[in-house]
C-alpha cells in the first residue's frame, strides 16, 4: 500500500545540518565500493567452489573425499589414488573444509546495513534524519518511559511506501495511518507497537519504509526498537546472520546513564562489533563551530565512560578515530559537524570484513596449491626413482643368487673335510653317547635278553638320529656363518627397496619379498630346517638306513652297551662324507634355483604393475601441472590482489622505466608503506599466460625474503586498464638503482664485478634450495642497488622442477643446449651463469663473436647445440676461464654445483683483488 506522503527525492538538498549532501555522497561511494569488491569476492568464492567440485568429480568412484566419508575404505594403494594424484589420506587437505566454506559463504552473502542504536528513541530518529538529510521521522514526541518504538527498516524503492512486515520479511496486510492521507513524517501511531493490540504478530512486526534515496540504494538502515520492547542484543542476533551491521549509537546527554552502560556491556559481551558513537545536536540548536568546542586534549565524561567500558582506547585521539588502514575500532564524535567521520568508520568496518574474507579464501588457495606442488614433486620423484629401484632390486637379487650359488659350490669340499674332521673328533664322544643312550618308547630288559625286531629297529633309528643331529649342527653353523655375512652386506637394503616397491601394490600380498626370503631360507634358516626334519634330513636318514640295513644278524641281538657302540661304529664308518656334502649342496642349489626363478617371475609381475601405475601417475602429474595448479593459482592471485587493493589501494603509475616481452615497468613512488617501488604491468593475452603469471606470483609470494632476490610487495588486478578494454596485473616490487647491463656499460671495477657474480650465485643457490629453477638468468635480470650489490629479478620463467613442462623458455644466448630437448633440470641456471660470468669478466656488454655472427635465433640455437660457446678474451684469468667452461659444459652432469662454484669465486676474488691492483682500463668505478 502506498501512502500519500512526501515523495523524497534521490538526492537530498544540502542544508545547514551535519548530514548534508557531501556526507551522503561519501557514504554512497563507500558502500558502493564495498558492493563492487564483495561481488568480486563472491565470484572468486563461486569459482573456488566449482574448482573443488570439479576436483571431487575427477576422483574415481569409491575413493573417499575425506577420511570421515571414506573411513577405512580405499586403503589399498590401487584404490586410494584419486585422479588428482593424491592419496585418499590427503584428499581432505585439498578439499574445501565445510566449516571454512560455510563461514566464507556467510561473509560474502551478508550485505551491509546501518543499525541505529541510541539513548532514547527520539535521538535515534534524529540521527536517521541526519543520515538521510531529510525529515522522515518525527522527533519531538517520541521518547520517554512510555515509548514503544517498533523496529524500523528503510530500504530503496522507486516509490514511497510504508508497510508492516514480520522478521522473516512476510508483509502484513494492515491499514496504517500513513495510508489514510497526506503526511510529512511517518505518523507516530505507525511507529509505535501497541502491546494492547489483539494481533501479537503486529506487535513484533517491523515498519518497512521504502523510499527513493541515493544512500538507501547502497545500504539499508535499521532503527532499533525500544529497549523495553526488545533487548538490543536480540536485535543484533537477528541481524548478524544476514547482514553486516555498521552500528551507530546516538547520544544527546553528556553522560551515559546506568541503563545505557548496561546495554553497551551486554553488546560487548556477546559481540565484537565496533560502534560509532555520535552526539546528536539538540533540536533547534545552531551548529557550533568546532573551534569553540572542548580542546582535543581534554577527555569528556562520555569518552572516559566509553574507555572504561572498553570501547575506546586512551591512546587514540579524542574522537577515538583509528588510522586509515588499521582494523576498525569504535569511535566517539561529540561535534555534530563531524558526522563525516562516519565515512571513515564505515569504510574501516566494511574493509575489515572484506580483508578478512579475502585473507581466509587466499589461505585455502595457498594451502591447497602448496599441496599440489608438493605432490608434483612426489610424483616426479616416483616417476624417476621407481624404475631405478626395480633395476636395483633385479641387480642385487642376482648378485645374492650368484653369491649363494658360489657358497654352495665352494663349500662342498669344505663340508666334506668338515664332516670327516667332525666325525674323527667326535667319534669317541658319539660312541659313548650312543652306548649311554636311553631309548624312548622302547622297553629294554635289565638282564639284556633279546627283544623283538620292531624294538631293534626303533633303537637303531634313535642311534642314527643322535649321530645325524650332531652332524647337522656342524653343517648348519658352517652355512649360517657365510650367509649372515651376505645378509649384513646388502640383503637389508634389498629388502627395504622391495618393501617400498610393494607399498604401492596390494599390502596384503608381498610375493616378491616372500621369494627373497625363500632364497635366504635355503641357507640361514638351515638350523630350523634341519631340526624340523627337512628334506635334507630325510635324505641323510635314507642314506644311513641303507647302511644299517646291510647289517645282518641271525637272531635278534641283546640290547647291551657293546651292541649300541657297535651299531654306532658301523653307522659312522659307513657314512660317505663326500656324498653327504654333495647331496647337501645339490639340494641347496635346487632350492636356490627354484626361489630365484620364482623371484624373477614375481619381480616381472611387480614391474608390470608399476608400469601401469607410473603411466597413470604421469597423466596425473600432467593434470596437476597443466590444470589443477594453474587454475587454483589464478584464484589465489585474484584473492590476494583483492586483499592488497583493499589494504593499500591501487598504486599510481609514474614514469615508464622500461619494457619487456610481456609487460611495462613503471616508477611508483610509494605503496603499502614501501618506498620507492617499481611497478610491472602485465596484460596476459590468453589463459596460458594468465596461469603462468599466477604461478609465478605464487612462487614469489611463497619465497622467504632473501637479500639476493628482489622483494615482491604485492599485486593488484586493474580491471579498468586501457580504459576498461583489458585486465592488467600490477606487480609492485622493490625498486633498485639499475640493471647489470647498464652497470657494465657504465663501467665497473673488477672487484665489484666479482662481488656481483658472487651475489648472483648466492641468489640462484637460494632459489634452487627452494626447489625453483629461474630459467632466465641474464644481464637485465640482475639488478644493482646503489652499493652495486646484486639482486635477481623477473621470476617470470621461474618454476619448481616438478612443475616444469619442458617448454623452451629463456633468452637465446643464455639457454643451455638441453633446453631445446625439453628435458632439463636446475643445471640450466649454471649454464646461464657461465655465460653471465663471461660478460662479468669481460667488463662489457659486447656479444661473444660466436653469437654475434648468428643471423637469427634459429641459427644461434643450432650453433649452441653444436657446441658454439663464447671465445676466450685476453683479459681473462685462467681460473675464471676454466670456471666458465665448466659451467657451460654441454653435458649437464659435468657442470659444477653452485655450492662448489661459490667458494671458487670467493677464492678468485681474494686472489685477484688482494694480490695486485687493477689495470687502468679495467678498474674504472662507475661514477653514476
UniProtKB/Swiss-Prot annotation:
Database matches in CDD domains: PKc_Dusty
Against Pfam families, the record matches this protein to: Pkinase
Name the residues that span the membrane.
Answer: none
What EC number(s) does the entry state? 2.7.12.1
Q: Where is the composition biased (Low complexity)?
A: 1-14
Keywords of this entry:
ATP-binding, Cell junction, Cell membrane, Coiled coil, Cytoplasm, Kinase, Membrane, Nucleotide-binding, Serine/threonine-protein kinase, Transferase, Tyrosine-protein kinase
Name the chain's protein: Dual serine/threonine and tyrosine protein kinase
In its UniProt entry, the species of origin is given as Bos taurus
**Phylogenetic lineage:** Eukaryota, Metazoa, Chordata, Craniata, Vertebrata
Name of encoding gene: DSTYK
Amino acid at each position: 500500500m502506498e501512502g500519500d506522503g512526501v515523495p523524497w527525492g534521490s538526492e537530498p538538498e544540502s542544508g545547514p545540518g551535519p548530514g548534508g549532501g557531501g556526507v551522503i555522497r561519501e557514504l554512497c561511494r563507500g558502500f558502493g565500493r564495498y558492493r563492487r569488491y564483495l561481488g568480486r569476492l563472491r565470484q572468486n568464492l563461486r569459482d573456488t567452489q566449482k574448482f573443488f567440485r570439479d576436483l571431487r568429480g575427477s576422483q574415481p568412484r569409491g575413493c573417499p573425499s575425506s577420511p570421515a566419508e571414506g573411513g577405512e575404505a580405499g586403503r589399498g594403494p590401487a584404490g586410494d589414488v584419486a585422479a588428482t594424484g593424491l592419496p585418499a589420506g590427503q584428499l581432505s587437505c585439498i578439499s574445501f573444509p565445510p566449516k571454512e566454506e560455510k563461514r566464507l559463504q556467510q561473509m560474502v552473502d551478508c550485505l551491509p546495513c546501518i543499525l541505529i542504536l541510541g539513548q532514547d528513541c527520539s535521538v535515534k530518529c534524529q540521527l536517521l534524519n541526519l543520515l538521510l538529510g531529510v525529515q522522515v521521522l518525527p522527533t519531538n514526541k517520541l521518547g520517554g518511559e512510555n515509548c514503544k518504538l517498533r523496529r524500523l527498516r528503510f530500504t530503496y524503492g522507486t516509490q514511497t511506501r510504508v508497510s508492516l512486515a514480520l522478521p522473516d520479511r512476510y508483509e502484513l496486510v494492515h491499514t496504517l495511518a500513513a495510508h489514510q492521507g497526506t503526511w510529512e513524517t511517518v505518523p507516530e501511531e505507525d511507529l509505535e507497537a501497541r502491546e494492547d493490540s489483539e494481533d501479537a504478530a503486529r506487535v513484533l512486526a517491523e515498519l518497512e519504509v521504502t523510499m527513493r534515496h541515493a544512500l538507501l540504494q547502497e545500504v539499508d538502515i535499521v532503527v532499533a526498537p525500544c529497549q523495553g520492547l526488545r533487548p538490543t542484543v536480540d536485535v543484533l542476533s537477528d541481524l548478524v546472520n544476514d547482514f553486516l551491521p555498521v552500528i551507530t549509537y546516538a547520544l544527546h546527554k553528556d553522560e551515559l546513564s546506568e541503563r545505557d552502560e548496561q546495554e553497551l556491556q551486554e553488546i560487548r559481551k556477546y559481540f565484537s562489533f565496533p560502534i560509532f558513537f555520535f552526539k546528536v545536536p539538540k533540536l533547534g540548536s545552531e551548529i557550533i563551530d568546532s573551534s569553540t568546542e572542548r580542546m582535543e586534549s581534554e577527555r569528556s565524561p562520555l569518552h572516559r565512560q566509553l574507555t572504561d567500558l572498553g570501547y575506546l582506547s586512551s591512546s587514540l585521539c579524542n574522537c577515538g578515530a583509528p588510522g586509515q588502514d588499521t582494523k576498525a575500532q569504535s569511535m566517539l564524535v561529540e561535534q555534530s559537524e563531524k558526522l563525516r567521520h562516519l565515512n571513515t568508520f564505515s569504510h574501516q568496518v566494511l574493509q575489515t570484513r572484506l580483508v578478512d574474507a579475502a585473507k581466509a579464501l587466499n589461505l585455502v588457495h595457498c594451502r591447497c596449491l602448496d599441496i599440489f606442488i608438493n605432490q608434483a614433486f612426489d610424483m616426479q620423484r616416483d616417476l624417476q626413482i621407481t624404475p631405478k629401484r626395480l633395476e636395483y632390486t633385479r641387480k642385487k637379487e642376482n648378485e645374492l643368487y650368484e653369491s649363494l650359488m658360489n657358497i654352495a659350490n665352494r663349500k662342498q669340499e669344505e663340508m666334506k673335510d668338515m664332516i670327516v674332521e667332525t666325525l674323527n673328533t667326535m667319534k669317541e664322544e658319539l660312541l659313548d653317547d650312543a652306548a649311554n643312550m636311553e631309548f624312548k618308547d622302547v622297553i629294554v630288559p635289565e638282564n639284556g635278553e633279546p627283544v623283538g625286531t620292531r624294538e631293534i629297529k626303533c633303537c637303531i633309528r634313535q642311534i642314527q638320529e643322535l649321530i645325524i643331529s650332531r652332524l647337522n649342527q656342524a653343517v648348519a653353523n658352517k652355512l649360517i656363518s657365510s650367509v649372515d655375512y651376505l645378509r649384513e652386506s646388502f640383503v637389508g637394503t634389498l629388502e627395504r627397496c622391495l618393501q617400498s616397491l610393494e607399498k604401492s601394490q596390494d599390502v596384503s600380498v608381498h610375493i616378491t619379498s616372500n621369494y627373497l626370503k625363500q632364497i635366504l631360507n635355503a641357507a640361514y634358516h638351515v638350523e630350523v630346517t634341519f631340526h624340523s626334519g627337512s628334506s635334507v634330513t630325510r635324505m641323510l636318514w635314507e642314506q644311513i638306513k641303507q647302511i644299517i640295513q646291510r647289517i645282518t644278524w641271525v637272531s635278534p641281538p641283546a640290547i647291551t652297551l657293546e651292541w649300541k657302540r657297535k651299531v654306532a661304529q658301523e653307522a659312522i664308518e659307513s657314512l660317505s662324507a663326500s656324498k653327504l656334502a654333495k647331496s647337501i649342496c645339490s639340494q641347496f642349489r635346487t632350492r636356490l634355483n627354484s626361489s630365484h626363478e620364482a623371484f624373477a617371475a614375481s619381480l616381472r609381475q611387480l614391474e608390470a604393475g608399476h608400469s601401469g601405475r607410473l603411466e597413470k601417475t604421469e597423466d596425473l602429474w600432467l593434470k596437476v601441472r597443466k590444470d589443477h595448479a594453474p587454475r587454483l593459482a589464478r584464484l589465489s592471485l585474484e584473492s590476494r590482489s583483492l586483499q592488497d587493493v583493499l589494504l593499500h589501494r591501487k598504486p599510481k603509475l609514474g614514469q615508464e622505466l622500461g619494457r619487456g616481452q610481456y609487460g611495462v615497468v613503471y616508477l611508483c613512488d610509494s605503496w603499502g608503506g614501501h618506498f620507492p617501488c617499481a611497478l610491472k604491468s602485465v596484460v596476459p593475452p590468453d589463459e596460458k599466460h594468465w596461469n603462468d603469471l599466477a604461478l609465478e606470483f605464487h612462487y614469489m609470494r611463497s619465497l622467504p625474503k632473501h637479500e639476493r632476490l628482489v622483494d615482491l610487495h604485492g599485486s593488484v588486478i586493474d580491471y579498468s586498464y586501457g580504459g576498461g578494454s583489458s585486465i592488467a596485473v600490477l606487480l609492485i616490487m622493490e625498486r633498485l638503482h639499475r640493471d647489470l647491463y647498464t652497470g657494465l656499460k657504465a663501467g665497473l671495477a673488477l672487484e665489484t664485478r666479482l662481488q656481483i657474480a658472487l651475489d648472483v650465485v648466492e641468489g640462484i643457490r637460494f632459489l634452487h634450495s627452494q626447489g625453483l629453477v629461474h630459467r632466465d638468468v641474464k644481464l637485465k635480470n640482475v639488478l644493482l642497488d646503489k652499493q652495486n650489490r646484486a639482486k635477481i629479478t623477473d621470476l617470470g620463467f621461474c618454476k619448481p622442477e616438478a612443475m616444469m613442462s619442458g617448454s623452451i623458455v629463456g633468452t637465446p644466448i643464455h639457454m643451455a643446449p638441453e633446453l631445446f630437448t625439453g628435458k632439463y633440470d636446475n643445471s640450466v641456471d649454471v649454464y646461464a651463469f657461465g655465460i653471465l660470468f663471461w660478460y662479468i669478466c669481460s667488463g662489457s656488454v659486447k656479444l661473444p663473436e660466436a653469437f654475434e655472427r648468428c643471423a637469427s635465433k634459429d641459427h644461434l640455437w643450432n650453433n649452441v647445440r653444436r657446441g658454439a660457446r663464447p671465445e676466450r678474451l685476453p683479459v681473462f684469468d685462467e681460473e675464471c676461464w676454466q670456471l666458465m667452461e665448466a659451467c657451460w659444459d654441454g653435458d649437464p652432469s659435468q657442470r659444477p654445483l653452485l655450492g662448489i662454484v661459490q667458494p671458487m669465486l670467493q677464492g678468485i676474488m681474494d686472489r685477484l683483488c688482494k694480490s695486485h691492483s687493477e689495470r687502468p682500463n679495467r678498474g674504472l668505478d662507475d661514477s653514476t
